[in-house]
């Protein structure tokens, strides 16, 4: 869409990162942490122009003097005042657009409480005066981005993981499973196991350093026991990482022990099934006739599925669980970190979608409840 005047805005608010941009683009223009920071101490320097809150990258860069809060927990918005700040920052500072001039497509977690959807709708129309808006389920958008309408999506981000079976474009709510195990838990676990090695990471600012170590060095082992043996026998798996203060730390079996907890949540002291079993359980909750189609279209999406080796391991684990004759295919597109946003960009630019928007007029006539009738 070349005329930016009417391009829809696509905003994917994740627990960890907010992705925003224009419908029709192939990648989000703005990607920033879903963080609101408030100063820990009163400013000493008068006239420094200190703000009472910072959002996104600015909050991140000033993290030493701020208390950081994430308004989205486990995929669901829990702090609306901070969320409004994030949306304001998205429109005015990141995309530099007037929200009253563009339709806005927002995303939501599967099984998002009804009241939450209504509140999102209300804020868009009443605070930002958008002409039209729509709320789409994240996993469904990821499936669209992979060019499918049927499949099961394993969407794992920073705050929550979901397995969502989708048939002919519709999510099957009775078979959606939620796993409160995602990137943030893995970062915390890596902090813990690095502490055992003698490196101490405790503050919110240091957690961000550990997150970076995780993203750069961690991977999923195909065979955990064998990998542990290799790590014990030689130093071939060790990598070094330079901290911001110049200190260099070495990390060995932590590289694969950390993401292994996706498959063995008992590492984190959790009793839930791993991601492979969750996918399997989700498929088993579906009608027997569509399972074959789901096994052949297992789509990975979200930042926590970015570990090298995760798709091969998933293939191996699901193959062990499923009937032996069945064809299993794991789809892990390289751009899966942003596939929810990309799916939103595709959806909002379809000509057939244009009648799906909730207009300001419809909202004024029916109130926030309209979102349940038009977005499903």
From Swiss-Prot:
Residues annotated with Methionine sulfoxide modification: 45, 48
Lineage: superkingdom: Eukaryota
Primary location recorded for the protein, binned into one broad class: cytoplasm
Localization: Cytoplasm, Cytoskeleton
Recorded catalytic activity of this chain's protein: ATP + H2O = ADP + phosphate + H(+)
Tissue: Muscle.
Propeptide residue span(s): 1-2
Claim: Hydrolase is one of the keywords in the record: yes
Positions where N-acetylaspartate occurs in the chain: 3
SUPFAM superfamilies registered for this protein in UniProt: Actin-like ATPase domain
Entry comment on modification after translation: Oxidation of Met-45 to form methionine sulfoxide promotes actin filament depolymerization. Methionine sulfoxide is produced stereospecifically, but it is not known whether the (S)-S-oxide or the (R)-S-oxide is produced.
Gene3D superfamilies (UniProt xref): 3.30.420.40, Actin, Chain A, domain 4
S-S bridge residues: none
GO cellular component, one term: cytoplasm
Keyword set, alphabetical order: Acetylation, ATP-binding, Cytoplasm, Cytoskeleton, Hydrolase, Muscle protein, Nucleotide-binding, Oxidation
Database matches in Pfam families: Actin
EC number: 3.6.4.-
MF term (GO), any: ATP binding
Functional note: Actins are highly conserved proteins that are involved in various types of cell motility and are ubiquitously expressed in all eukaryotic cells.
Similarity comment: family membership: Belongs to the actin family.
Protein name: Actin-3, muscle-specific
């Amino acid at each position: 869409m070349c005329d930016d005047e009417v391009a829809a805005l696509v905003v994917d608010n994740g627990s960890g990162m907010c992705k925003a941009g224009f419908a029709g683009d192939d990648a989000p223009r703005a990607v920033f942490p879903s963080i609101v920071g408030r100063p820990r101490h009163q400013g000493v320097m008068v006239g420094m122009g200190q703000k009472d809150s910072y959002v996104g990258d600015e909050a991140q860069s000033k993290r030493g003097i701020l208390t950081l809060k994430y308004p989205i927990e486990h995929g669901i918005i829990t702090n609306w005042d901070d969320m409004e700040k994030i949306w304001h920052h998205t429109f005015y500072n990141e995309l530099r657009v007037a929200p009253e001039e563009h339709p806005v497509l927002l995303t939501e977690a599967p099984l998002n409480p009804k009241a939450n959807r209504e509140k999102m709708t209300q804020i868009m129309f009443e605070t930002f005066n958008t002409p039209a808006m729509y709320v789409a389920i994240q996993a469904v958008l990821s499936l669209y981005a992979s060019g499918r309408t049927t499949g099961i999506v394993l969407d794992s981000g920073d705050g929550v993981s979901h397995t969502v079976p989708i048939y002919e474009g519709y999510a099957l709510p009775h078979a959606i499973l939620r796993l409160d195990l995602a990137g943030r838990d893995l970062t915390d676990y890596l902090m813990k196991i690095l502490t055992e090695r003698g490196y101490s990471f405790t503050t919110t600012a240091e957690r961000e350093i550990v997150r970076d170590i995780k993203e750069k060095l961690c991977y999923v082992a195909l065979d955990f026991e064998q990998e542990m043996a290799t790590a014990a026998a030689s130093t071939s798996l060790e990598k070094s990482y330079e901290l911001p203060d110049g200190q260099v730390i070495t990390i060995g079996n932590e590289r694969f022990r950390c993401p292994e907890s996706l498959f063995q949540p008992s590492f984190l002291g959790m009793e839930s099934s791993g991601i492979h079993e969750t996918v399997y359980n989700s498929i088993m909750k579906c009608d027997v006739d569509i399972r074959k189609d789901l096994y052949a279209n297992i789509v990975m999406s979200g930042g926590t599925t970015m570990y090298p080796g995760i798709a091969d391991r998933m293939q191996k684990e699901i193959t062990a669980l499923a009937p032996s004759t069945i064809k299993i295919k794991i789809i892990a597109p390289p751009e899966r970190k942003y596939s929810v946003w990309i799916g939103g960009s595709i959806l909002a630019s379809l000509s057939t979608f244009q009648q799906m928007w909730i207009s300001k007029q419809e909202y004024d006539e029916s109130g926030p409840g309209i979102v349940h009738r038009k977005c499903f």
